[in-house]
């Protein structure tokens, strides 16, 4: 009986040690066992245009619409775009191109006044420009593509979290609600009315009512389209000082940050998400 009792105690001790070792190993491998995994996708509402009625939801990567705000990266992207936008066509006259002689305007001594040089001196109001450059001047700067993609996603995320990003679409997804009769599943206005056998385009009237209905008149708006939308361009032409209609391939960080409301087609959002997500993943893998 004593041998059997000792054997049972030994087995229990071995089992306890094995359980303790397993728990210790798990705690070592996972120091935060109760930590939640952050979501990889955010549900974005898809709407019709111009009523902005919700139609359905689509998952969009959180790296595109829910990225944490990084003002430093946004600033680098804005400076990069503005530098590359500079034409560099200025051609100011230098000392050798101003046309004046090299003779001193006054003697070096004896006049009782301060010393002066020739008429080409940059200190004179009609003198040559100091360190004048000859056009063309290249002011472009460089920025890693990974950093620019992060800035682009930051700009979209900032507008989305501020409630100023509206996704328009519904042609390629299952709709929860039907599209209203006078609406479209894209950023366009093609409504016409027939009067005495002639078709009259009413897009400008509809667009004006759209601005008044959602209190957008006088605000800077950005419409990002998948393709060229002639109806939208024609309708927004009277407000071109405040309204920008840009195709998805030509959108910049400046455009997104400058806008007070952004309307983007679902296909364009998918294109931008894949383009900049691929760029980030490619840079990380390298």
Swiss-Prot record:
<dbReference type="GO" id="GO:0032543">
    <property type="term" value="P:mitochondrial translation"/>
</dbReference>
<comment type="similarity">
    <text>Belongs to the universal ribosomal protein uL4 family.</text>
</comment>
<dbReference type="GO" id="GO:0005762">
    <property type="term" value="C:mitochondrial large ribosomal subunit"/>
</dbReference>
<dbReference type="InterPro" id="IPR023574">
    <property type="entry name" value="Ribosomal_uL4_dom_sf"/>
</dbReference>
<keyword id="KW-0687">Ribonucleoprotein</keyword>
<dbReference type="GO" id="GO:0005743">
    <property type="term" value="C:mitochondrial inner membrane"/>
</dbReference>
<dbReference type="GO" id="GO:0003735">
    <property type="term" value="F:structural constituent of ribosome"/>
</dbReference>
<dbReference type="Pfam" id="PF00573">
    <property type="entry name" value="Ribosomal_L4"/>
</dbReference>
<dbReference type="GO" id="GO:0005739">
    <property type="term" value="C:mitochondrion"/>
</dbReference>
<keyword id="KW-0496">Mitochondrion</keyword>
<keyword id="KW-0689">Ribosomal protein</keyword>
<feature type="transit peptide" description="Mitochondrion">
    <location>
        <begin position="1"/>
        <end position="26"/>
    </location>
</feature>
<dbReference type="InterPro" id="IPR013005">
    <property type="entry name" value="Ribosomal_uL4-like"/>
</dbReference>
<keyword id="KW-0809">Transit peptide</keyword>
<dbReference type="InterPro" id="IPR002136">
    <property type="entry name" value="Ribosomal_uL4"/>
</dbReference>
<protein>
    <recommendedName>
        <fullName>Large ribosomal subunit protein uL4m</fullName>
    </recommendedName>
</protein>
<comment type="subunit">
    <text>Component of the mitochondrial large ribosomal subunit (mt-LSU). Mature yeast 74S mitochondrial ribosomes consist of a small (37S) and a large (54S) subunit. The 37S small subunit contains a 15S ribosomal RNA (15S mt-rRNA) and 34 different proteins. The 54S large subunit contains a 21S rRNA (21S mt-rRNA) and 46 different proteins.</text>
</comment>
<feature type="region of interest" description="Disordered">
    <location>
        <begin position="85"/>
        <end position="132"/>
    </location>
</feature>
<comment type="function">
    <text>Component of the mitochondrial ribosome (mitoribosome), a dedicated translation machinery responsible for the synthesis of mitochondrial genome-encoded proteins, including at least some of the essential transmembrane subunits of the mitochondrial respiratory chain. The mitoribosomes are attached to the mitochondrial inner membrane and translation products are cotranslationally integrated into the membrane.</text>
</comment>
């Amino acid at each position: 009986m004593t041998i059997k009792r000792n054997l049972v105690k030994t087995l229990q001790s071995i089992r306890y040690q094995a359980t303790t070792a397993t728990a210790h190993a798990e705690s070592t491998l996972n120091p935060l066992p109760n930590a939640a995994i952050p979501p990889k996708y955010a549900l974005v509402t898809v709407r019709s245009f111009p009523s902005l009625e919700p139609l359905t939801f689509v998952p969009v990567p959180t790296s595109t619409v829910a990225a944490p705000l990084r003002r430093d990266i946004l600033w680098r992207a804005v400076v990069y775009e503005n530098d590359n936008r500079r034409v560099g066509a200025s051609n100011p006259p230098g000392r050798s191109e101003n046309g004046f002689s090299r003779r001193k305007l006054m003697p070096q001594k004896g006049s009782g006044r301060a010393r002066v040089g020739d008429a080409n001196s940059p200190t004179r109001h009609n003198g040559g420009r100091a360190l004048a450059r000859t056009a063309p001047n290249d002011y472009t700067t460089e920025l890693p593509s990974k950093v620019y993609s992060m800035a682009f996603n930051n700009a979209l995320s900032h507008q989305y979290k501020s409630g100023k990003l509206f996704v328009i679409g519904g042609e390629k997804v299952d709709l929860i609600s039907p599209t209203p009769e006078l609406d479209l599943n894209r950023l366009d206005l093609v409504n016409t009315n027939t009067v005495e056998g002639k078709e009259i385009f009413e897009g400008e009237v509809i667009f004006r009512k759209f601005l008044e209905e959602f209190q957008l008149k006088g605000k800077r708006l950005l419409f990002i389209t998948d393709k060229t939308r002639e109806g939208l361009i024609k309708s927004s032409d009277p407000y071109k000082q405040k309204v920008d209609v840009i195709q998805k391939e030509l959108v910049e960080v400046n455009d997104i940050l400058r806008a007070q409301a952004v309307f983007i087609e679902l296909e364009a959002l998918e294109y931008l998400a894949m383009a900049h997500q691929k760029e980030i993943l490619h840079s990380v893998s390298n």
